[in-house]
Amino acid sequence: MKIVRTVHEWQQLQKSFQGKSLGFVPTMGALHEGHMALVQNSVSDNDVTVVSIFVNPTQFNNPDDLENYPSTFEQDVSNLNDWKVDVLFFPEANELYPDNFAFSVDENKDSLALCGLDRPGHFKGVLTVVMKLLNIIQATRAYFGEKDYQQYRLIQNMVACFFMPTEIVGVPTRRDREGLALSSRNLRLSPEELTTARKVNKILSSETLSAEVRREKIENLGLKIDYLEERWGRRFIAAHIGSVRIIDNVSLGEEETIK
């Protein structure tokens, strides 16, 4: 696996991949089996797979979240090699933001709901960095997990609206044996908090509970709910367990077409 740090270095390397399909998996590191599922899809679908690791500072509302975001770079590199990744793009912040975030991408509809309500500016940071990465990598396909379904929806719409050629592929959420959605943030949960978090998906997925009872059961676990609602044919939750914010969603069977 080659590791490249600059846009220029990638552009030179990219010339050797002409005529080949290119899959791209953008990440912020702290890789787990959920990321592995994205990579496996890319390796299966494409001739070449590129993974980026970049902890994007512009999508964090809370400076403590940025400072405390887990970093496991050496293990990440080992995993990427095991997963048969061809290239790791690992830029510094000033490489992707030479303008110091003077230019940005805003969406004024779907980004204002759910996570957008509690994290103003978050999706501006996400969409801006993803547009930059897609323009840099010029991939045939890019892969995003459905755990972050709102993000996936926004990125797919952005790519369509700006006539970008990369196909955006959604990959179903990877979960542990007890149903907890895999997330880098899970590393920050204590054993007791993990036990609590694993109970949330069962409540979220239940079709026998009313909305009121579902909320009550989750609050009785000690979680502080940011939102618990249904839209786009899915049921969404964001809640705090201690200092850690977790999100999840489940399909209700008839999902609204992304457009």
Report the location of each language-model feature.
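Nucleotidyltransferase catalytic core that binds NTPs
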Residues: K2-E216, N220, R231, S243
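Phosphate/ribose-recognition catalytic cores of enzymes acting on nucleotide-derived substrates
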Residues: K217-K259
